[in-house]
Amino acid sequence: MKSYCLLLSITLSCCCSAEDLPDPPSIHLNSKYLPNQAEAILTAGTPFTLRCTGASSVHWSSSAFCLLYHGRLVDPIDVQRADPRHTGTYCCGYTNQSLEHLSTWIHLYVKDPADPSTVFVTPRNSPRVKEGQDFLYRCLLTDPSVTNLTFQPEDNIQGSGQHLPVGMNVTVDPQRGALIQDVQRSFSGQYVCSGWKDGRHFISRSFHLLVAPRLPPPSVAIHQNKAVRLEGEKFEVTCVSSSTTHLFNVTWTHLTKKNFDVAVTREYRNSHMYISSTLMIAAVSQEDRGTYTCAAASEDGVTTATTHLIVLDSRFMTTYLKTWHANTKAKNKEISKEIDGNLTANSTSIDIEANRSSKLHMKMELIANVSTDGVHVNNISSSTTVEAYEGLDVILTFVTESYPPLSNQSWTKPTKVNNNNNVTMYQENYSINDTRSEASLLLRRVRQEDHGSYTFHFSNSFFSGSQNIDLRIYRSPSAIISVEKNTLTCSSSGYPVPTIAWYSCPGILKTCGNLTTTESSEADPTSEHDEENVRKLLNLPLSTGGDVTAECIASNQVGAFRKVFHLREHNSAFMSALIGAGSTAAILFLLLLVVFYKWRQKPKYEIRWKIIESTEGNHYTFVDPTLLPYNYKWEFPRDKLRLGAVLGSGAFGKVVEATAYGLGTDDVTRVAVKMLKPRALSEEREALMSELKILSHLGYHDNIVNLLGACTQGGPMLMITEYCSYGDLLNFLRARAQDFMASILSADEMEGDPFYKNMATLYGRLRSDSGISCCSDYQEMQPILGSAEKQQGVQMGGLSFGDLLSFSHQVAQGLDFLSTRNCIHRDVAARNVLLTDHRVAKICDFGLARDIQNDDSYIVQGNARLPVKWMAPESIFQCVYTVQSDVWSYGVLLWEIFSLGKSPYPNVAVDTHFYKMIKDGRHMTQPDFAPVEMYQLMTHCWSLEPTDRPTFKMICQLIDRLLQSNDDTNHQSYSNINETKKDDFKGGKSQRRGEEEEQRRQRGNLWIPLSVTNIYQLS
């Protein structure tokens, strides 16, 4: 009320030019004049009279609780006995509405010294406020001498120290009360107003603030966001709105139109009120086009939805062709012709440059643009040529904007293109949305037999036609030479059409290409060709004067093909044959010697995984894997498997990425396929079959690379396993070592810390100390991304301390599973752990696909190559392999993980000193990033006595507790790592380890002593 009167007074003061306006009313208290905005103090129990005089009739309004509900007050206000609840603002104004801005107000304080509880007067009811609104709690002060006014929780008065809720902004005014801005649900509670006078603390009666939750505004939806109509057609659109309250309405607006024909229906169901508002236009015109907005409004807010109306004066059709194919550059040749119905059809011939990148590029071209005002148009047709490389995907998409919308769309393909054996070689997709339609044809990994004419047919009630696409597949040339009398004919085929050149040179040579040759010009050569075949003739001389080599070279942008013809003199034929036979025999003999030598030098492959048949102490009897049964349910059709890029290769075999169609429940599955190289012997074939049998015997587990299928008949043996896109763990850690170290050091520490200055050196050491010889032809496992993933910008992310613990835990789970299946791995190392795209660690054995002959991780012992630095002492010195020896190797793998991919025993050669160090029980030092618990686990894994080593089940339980602790103390763990790095470089490693041990004891006893007898129950 006071604010309203103040606003009127300010308005009055600004209107100085209005000389004909009367003066504001004047107020008298007990016959004493009080100026505008004056304050007066009364004592409770005394009478008072307020009188207002002015140029015309006046009326009163007041914020006093005693007079608040009296309705319109009349002059004068006569009170026989003043009460503290008469405290408030009294405003007098003219009853004439044109003079409402002229008003006068005063504020009365009615204090009662005998009753301290009346220092504040408050409403009798607890307020209920809606969330998000401002709220004025009128705790009115009756004694202006009370100062230090505050608004606070009631519990704070009792000494609990409770403060206002977070985000509560309160302004206390002695004349108005406490204004709370933007009330939130967290503000609910008991509050009081308080103040101080002469050392005494006065508080108001407490009140309970109830905050009603803010209701969402009504929902609104228009299912048709765009509509197209011809002039004179009917248009209807329905807007559906719903809310939990009945108090909302729905309205339509348009930029130019004001009046609408609207039908409204209401329905209450499921505790919601639904309002459907349908806007109707009987015959649209150009004035009706534009955006129509449907607004649903309530006291909780306004929600809108729009639809756009397009008004056409004639029917139309516009068609585009989008082609997705390999990285190409199109060279367009436009051909235009007139067709009935004011149609211009454009066809484009596309020439593709020789770039075999698998990244897809899109090109869009206009095919047809037609309009008609009522005549049916037929024969909307044109032709387009698309060229593609064999083995790549091609996507043909026709995009049509038309009115009326298309009612029929279809593709016809060459008869030889079909989906055989339930393998989808092509896929059609159709969509129609309002006036826009799309028809796509996906051809997967096109082959030569896929070339030909592809036709798209379309129609609606006014337009019909077809678009033809001539698909050409690039093909490298082939050539043959035929002889007829004295004429050589070189016939070549390929696409693009090859270019043929004849060359001749004296003597019998393999090729004329390395000599100074000239194109034959004896007799004019003739040529003839069609789109894919070409012939060129060469006339031979009647007398050659010796042996002559004629060479035909056919080439196009895909490749070149050479064909040689030897013309011999008769007297030299026998000598040439004799020389040729002798040379061939000598070459064959040398080749046999080389092959025999290589065969003697080639290491015999042995599969690392072993299945235990029985045990007697430390003596294990292993199952011969060749005797394991093979279940032919694993067989998978070869024609449903498309091989891709090589993931890894070795001396005996390789692993390639592949796509399997119809494997399991998925239509398309990305897999890895292990296969033998062509020069592999029967021993390698038997080894791969043994590995297949072992995997099928083990069964499924999340943390091993699981078998998905196999092809053992009708061709080379293929073993199909899960695909792990991140490659092996070793390279994964090394690739992210620098980012991991940077993430655990703050920017300030990096500027002055000597560790940061040496990061590049350390990173270089991580990269160079790989254990792979520089002369090795072994291709390490690498992640390969498909084209779709590249387009989406797949980010493989960084590396965290939690990731290191997770990898350790998952590998332990996988090895625990192997131990329960009586399986010994014998080559546990980071290089034999793969990561999926979700960073799931899976144990594998590269086996045939790892070149151990050129891998420095494998050391020659006798006639075998062994991973000595990962092997347990009993395996090195006694050739004993047990589950406990896998535990030793797992400890070395942990060292690899927490050193971010360093090679174990860095800078230590495998010699007599190394073997003595192993026998003496000397361990590697704690890795840079390993907590105390993990290093203790490593040392327990390296116990000289195998039975003192922990079981994999115990290891899983320990790391599981560390993972849970890491979630709770993630920030603290990184702080410890930062301190660790500084201490290592500053010589304080022992002190740091003592501090970490103390922190470990404070966090709780996560470590359980693992030096207990390890007895695996093998059954």
UniProtKB/Swiss-Prot annotation:
Active site, per annotation: D827
A single cellular component GO annotation: CSF1-CSF1R complex
Subcellular location: Cell membrane
Organism the protein comes from: Takifugu rubripes (Japanese pufferfish)
GO molecular function: ATP binding; cytokine binding; growth factor binding; macrophage colony-stimulating factor receptor activity
Extracellular side: 19-576
Location of the Ig-like C2-type domain: 37-109, 106-212, 224-312, 383-474, 487-567
PROSITE patterns: IG_LIKE, PROTEIN_KINASE_ATP, PROTEIN_KINASE_DOM, PROTEIN_KINASE_TYR, RECEPTOR_TYR_KIN_III
UniProt modification remark: Autophosphorylated in response to CSF1 binding. autophosphorylation, leading to its degradation. Ubiquitinated. Becomes rapidly polyubiquitinated after autophosphorylation, leading to its degradation.
Protein name: Macrophage colony-stimulating factor 1 receptor 2
Annotated region (Activation loop), positions in chain: 845-867
Superkingdom of origin: Eukaryota
Domain notes: The juxtamembrane domain functions as autoinhibitory region. Phosphorylation of tyrosine residues in this region leads to a conformation change and activation of the kinase. The activation loop plays an important role in the regulation of kinase activity. Phosphorylation of tyrosine residues in this region leads to a conformation change and activation of the kinase.
Function comment: Tyrosine-protein kinase that acts as a cell-surface receptor for CSF1 and plays an essential role in the regulation of survival, proliferation and differentiation of hematopoietic precursor cells, especially mononuclear phagocytes, such as macrophages and monocytes. Plays an important role in innate immunity and in inflammatory processes. Plays an important role in the regulation of osteoclast proliferation and differentiation, the regulation of bone resorption, and is required for normal bone development.
Summary of subunit composition and partner proteins: Monomer. Homodimer. Interacts with CSF1.
Residue(s) carrying Phosphotyrosine: Y620, Y756, Y778, Y858, Y974, Y1016
Catalytic activity: L-tyrosyl-[protein] + ATP = O-phospho-L-tyrosyl-[protein] + ADP + H(+)
Ranges of compositional bias, category Basic and acidic residues: 979-1001
Region (Regulatory juxtamembrane domain): 601-633
Alphabetic keyword roster: ATP-binding, Cell membrane, Disulfide bond, Glycoprotein, Immunity, Immunoglobulin domain, Inflammatory response, Innate immunity, Kinase, Membrane, Nucleotide-binding, Phosphoprotein, Receptor, Repeat, Signal, Transferase, Transmembrane, Transmembrane helix, Tyrosine-protein kinase, Ubl conjugation
This enzyme's EC code(s): 2.7.10.1
Extent of the signal sequence: 1-18
Protein kinase domain sequence ranges: 641-963
Enzyme class label: transferase
